[in-house]
Amino acid sequence: MKISANSIRTGNILVYSNDLWVVSRTPEHTQPGKGGAYVQVEMKNLKTGTKRNERFSSSDYLEKAELEQKDYQFLYFEGNDLVLMDIKHFDQINVPKEILEEKLPFLAENMIVKVEFYNEKPLNIELPPTVIIEISETDPVIKGATATASYKPAILTNGIKVKVPQYLEIGEKIVVKTDDMTYVERAK
């Protein structure tokens, strides 16, 4: 399936130069003063593990790999693998931790994830778009900070650092996007 360079997202698997590449960082859309707009994409080769930066014109179309997607439940870690269970057939599979890379801290026990297969081999794991996590460290609340739109650093219970509004305190639960690790809102 062909997709526009502007539609490329983190986690997409592309067929490029006769190999499978996973987009490992949020693509940067750039509109320079001279010349046409382009998209800067960081990709990782799924066979060799090498990383590469490519620049595509906004008008380019790329081949997105046709993947089979199944829902699995994360059970536990076993060495360097994740043990997942198919929620329909209850079959268990082991998938290397490296597939998740920097998103691994967002994985929680019993979380439902989407596993993408290419020729019956697991290639990618999609986490839910947002997760609820507790703040474990942050600066104290500053009086009168609710009116300003400034942010302060916070460390979550999974070790991830995010910027949060000034009014949030340690122990509060927040919603965080899993694709770019940014604060969304206070959990309800």
Swiss-Prot record:
| Pathway in which this enzyme or protein is active | Protein biosynthesis; polypeptide chain elongation
InterPro entries found in the cross-reference section: Elong-fact-P_C, NA-bd_OB-fold, Rib_uL2_dom2, Transl_elong_fac_P/YeiP, Transl_elong_KOW-like, Transl_elong_P/YeiP_cen, Transl_elong_P/YeiP_CS, Transl_elongation_fac_P
Which positions make up the signal peptide?
Answer: none
GO CC terms = cytoplasm
Give the UniProt record's GO annotations in the biological process aspect.
peptide biosynthetic process
Describe the task this protein carries out.
Involved in peptide bond synthesis. Stimulates efficient translation and peptide-bond synthesis on native or reconstituted 70S ribosomes in vitro. Probably functions indirectly by altering the affinity of the ribosome for aminoacyl-tRNA, thus increasing their reactivity as acceptors for peptidyl transferase.
NCBIfam families (UniProt xref): efp (TIGR00038), PRK00529.1 (NF001810)
Hey, which family's this protein in?
Answer: Belongs to the elongation factor P family.
Protein's recorded name: Elongation factor P
Q: Which gene encodes it?
A: efp
